[in-house]
Amino acid sequence: YKYQNADGKKFAVFAADFQNSPSCANYFNNYYRQAQVTECAKWLCGRKLPAVCTGNPNLYIMTAKDEKSVSVLLVNIFMDEIYKPEITLDRKYSRIKFVGCNGELNGDTVNLTKLAPYGFAAFEAEI
């Protein structure tokens, strides 16, 4: 659940015994939890995350951002290919450069052609 105290401090609470319960080993490794954590992060920070690609729990995303651009690295740590990954950015961008992949930019959305098993892709989007 999400909670904001009288001082305006925000908390996101995941009620599970992660330390002592083997059933919680994959608690965060599923589609629904990924969407929930993404939404909680947006609420906690008061702004969108720089890049989000839900529906792929074994996809790791790293970002670097400044006032005019965002650089994104996607690493697929699973044995299955990710077909047509769709990455939602925190704002609209007008130009993009791809590294190790092909795709297209549509405002705040980047559509890649595919991401190979254990593969990576990267791009830099600019205002």
Residue ranges of predicted features:
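Generic beta-strand structural signal
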Residues: K65, E104-N106
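Small side chains
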Residues: P85, G103, A121-A125
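C-terminal beta-strand-rich structural cap/linker in extracellular carbohydrate-active enzymes
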Residues: D108-I127
